[in-house]
From Swiss-Prot:
Residues 1-49, 64-100 are annotated as: Disordered. Coiled coil: none annotated. One of its GO terms (cellular component) is ascus epiplasm. Promotes unequal transmission of alleles from the parental zygote to progeny spores by acting as poison/antidote system where the poison and antidote proteins are produced from the same locus; the poison component is trans-acting and targets all spores within an ascus whereas the antidote component is spore-specific, leading to poisoning of all progeny that do not inherit the allele. InterPro entries: WTF. Keywords: Cytoplasm, Endoplasmic reticulum, Membrane, Toxin, Transmembrane, Transmembrane helix, Vacuole. It comes from Schizosaccharomyces pombe. Belongs to the WTF family. This is Meiotic driver wtf35. GO terms for biological process: meiotic drive. Homomer. Forms protein aggregates. The two isoforms can interact with each other and with themselves. High sequence similarity is required for their interaction. The lineage of its organism: Eukaryota, Fungi, Dikarya, Ascomycota, Taphrinomycotina. Residues 1-29 have a biased composition (Basic and acidic residues). The gene is wtf35. It holds the Pfam family WTF.
Length: 280
């Protein structure tokens, strides 16, 4: 076996540059690596200790907080190699994957039940005022009560099932209504005039119907009239004069259309009279 002798001109610095490592002057140069058995390691190498090996790798690549990429996040989903890579999205901390925006049970029940109370309050107050609350009821009266209870149940069911929808709609309507508060006095005056003009036919109908049917007709026309008054008040507050303006526009539109047709029929001039040279 031949001995390998290094020439005298080769210095320790040149060996360090050649091997790309720093040589410990006390321990000497690194021994040669035997590729056949692969077991030869430097006697003073830190790789003999696995813990130090991990620390050296960390120091080598400088894995610390200062060199962490800004877009890296432990909560991001891993990128797969199948097909198109999905975008980096944060994981949601919801068990069902959807947010629950529903209102609390008690508030939902209270508001839905309040709508039924407001629906039944006028009828109950009127019956108590007439001292006819569950007194001397016949088949027709009990049929009407049953129909009223069924209507209340249907209203409560819809109020409960579509709670989120109708509460948002009512909230937006109230906000829009409050923006038009300057129109409220005029709308109230128009509703008052509406009650005066329609009040006399209601009184006549109650007298014509008689005592037996007077209660039902009076109750029905009171409810219908109250609803109409509320609708007129809302419409005239949000858009004053909208109903009257629409009627006037239609009348003006019909008159203008008739006048236009009349002008076209009697004042149209033939083209040959306008251009007599065209005949020649």
């Amino acid at each position: 076996m031949k001995n390998k002798d290094y020439p005298l001109r080769t210095s320790m610095d040149e060996l360090s540059t050649k091997n790309d490592n720093e040589i410990d002057l006390e321990k000497g140069p690194l021994p040669e690596y035997n590729s056949e058995d692969g077991s030869t390691l430097p006697p003073y190498s830190d790789l003999n200790n696995p813990k130090q090996m991990g620390q050296n790798i960390t120091k080598l690549f400088n894995w610390n907080k200062s060199t962490t990429p800004p877009d890296y996040d432990e909560n991001r989903l891993p990128i797969t190699d199948e097909g198109n890579n999905p975008p980096n999205t944060h994981r949601e901390n919801h068990s069902s994957g959807t947010t629950d925006n529903s209102s609390p049970f008690l508030i939902k029940l209270l508001i839905s039940f309040t709508s039924i109370i407001l629906f039944n309050a006028p009828a109950v107050c009127y019956l108590k005022y007439k001292d006819a609350f569950f007194k001397n009821y016949g088949a027709a009266e009990w049929t009407l009560i049953g129909f009223w209870c069924a209507s209340s149940l249907i209203i409560f069911t819809f109020s409960w099932y579509f709670y989120e929808t109708w509460t948002k709609a009512v909230g937006k309507g109230i906000k829009h209504f409050l923006k038009k508060w300057r129109n409220i006095p005029m709308a109230f005056s128009e509703v008052f005039l509406f009650n005066i003009l329609v009040g006399s036919p209601r009184v006549a109908l109650r007298h014509i119907s008689g005592e037996r049917w007077g209660l039902k007709c009076s109750l029905a026309d009171h409810i219908i009239f109250a609803i109409l008054s509320i609708l007129v008040f809302i419409v005239e507050t949000v858009e004053p004069g909208s109903s009257k303006i629409n009627i006037m526009k239609r009348l003006r539109g019909d008159n203008a259309r008739d006048a236009t047709q009349h002008v076209n029929e009697y004042t149209a001039v033939p083209l040959r009279e306008m251009n007599p040279e065209s005949e020649a």
